Amino acid sequence: MMKKTLSIAISAVVALAIVCTLIYMFAFRTLTVVSDSAFSLVLPKSTMRDLRSSMFFKGIRVKTAFLDDEAFDNAEAFKTSLGKVKGSYVLLGPVSSAYAESKRINVSDLLNESTVIAIYGKKSSLFDCVLVSDEKSGWVKVAQELSSEFEKTAQNVALIYENDAVPYVQDIKDCFSDSRLTVFEDDTQSRLFATETLKKTDELSIVVAMCPYDGHLSDFFKTTGTLSWVVDYRFANAVPKKQLYGIVVPSLSRSLKAVLNTEKGASAVSNLEYDYEKL
């Protein structure tokens, strides 16, 4: 009798699992993230895990579609590859979005059964919605957390950036008292900047540096160092793992929640918000 009861219970669980799987596969709407060799290399796996979890509770299944390098050979190859993508929503990565814009490919028309969302720098009629990157929001969070973290220590935090490349420097500075932040502005474009900066951070016993952008970032790692770094997620691979303190990453889940109700053909604009992920 017990074996029969157990068998019935197991069968019921299996049946429920099958039903849930069918609901997930066929009843849920679909968000397809269009990736490429560049985007897949730098986008943290944690970002996609968070997106899948967040969208699940919205009744949306997340999947990915990959465009290989040949898809960017010419406009026709791009349209052929992208035209195969299906989904209630289609999110284009930065490279795909920029390519479509450069070739003036109307992706909203190409994928006429999907709401097309692009990661791009400005409003465009080629997509149904554009997420404009707001890196400042992420770097302000970094500054606030590091300011709080090192408030009771004798150590300063460094801000290293390339001249004129980071428009929100003052917003970062405002999170610190003048005595707790040491700023290194790369305005010489000299390769000696990295050597001189590392020497100075060592003299000041600085252990963590924020670097929103510096074209010479790799110069800081030509020799073994102890300085820890917070960088944009796109440059994380340039930093030795043992020196990577944190990254600033796009919050796809939070940003997409705000645009799920976008109507087809709306040419809407919204912010792509960023978060600080301490490693």
Over which residues does each language-model region extend?
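Flexible loop/turn connectors
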Residues: L227, Y233-L279
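Extracytoplasmic "Venus flytrap"
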Residues: T32-E76
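An alpha-beta-alpha
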Residues: S137-R180, A266-L279
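Periplasmic-binding protein-like
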Residues: V34-S35, K86-S97, I117-I119, A158-Y161, ...
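Flexible loop/hinge segments that line or gate small-molecule binding clefts
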Residues: I105-S133, R234-K241
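Short beta-strand elements at the ligand-binding edges of bilobed clamshell
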Residues: K123-S148, P240-S253
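Hydrophobic membrane-insertion alpha-helices, especially the h-region
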Residues: A9-I23
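Short, well-structured alpha-helical segments in soluble
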Residues: F72-S88, N106, S190-L204
